[in-house]
Regions:
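Catalytic core of non-heme Fe(II) oxygenases with the double-stranded beta-helix
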Residues: 1-109
Length: 109
């Protein structure tokens, strides 16, 4: 998933694919940026699937630092929904049984 924020107060991501399915442990994690979507931005601005949204987010996050959460089976990551975040690439072993699967839960106040 590319860089985006979500229309929620709290996000919970849970990775459910076993570690033995991972080809490259330097990938498959989650990047959580230190910047959050500004309150005046619309959902389309911070979660749009178009070039205008992409360029706006790219410019806003230009010098932003992020934390990288490494992939780990059965790991839950809890963070603020308006924090920009993205999948840290994906490189799993070949085969349907090795696909990276996660559940994402979005919670309001």
């Amino acid at each position: 998933m590319g860089v985006h924020a979500d229309p929620s107060f709290i996000n919970v991501n849970i990775w459910i694919t076993p570690d033995e399915c991972v080809e490259d442990f330097n990938k498959n994690g989650l990047r959580i940026y230190h910047k959050h979507a500004p309150k005046e931005w619309t959902r389309e601005d911070y979660n749009g699937d178009n070039i205008k949204s992409y360029l706006k987010m790219k410019s806003y996050l230009k010098d932003s630092k992020y934390d990288r959460i490494p992939y780990k089976y059965n790991r839950a990551i809890i963070f603020k929904g308006r924090a920009f975040h993205s999948t840290d690439n994906v490189h799993m072993k070949q085969g349907e049984e090795n696909k990276r699967v996660n559940y994402t839960f979005l919670y309001e106040y």
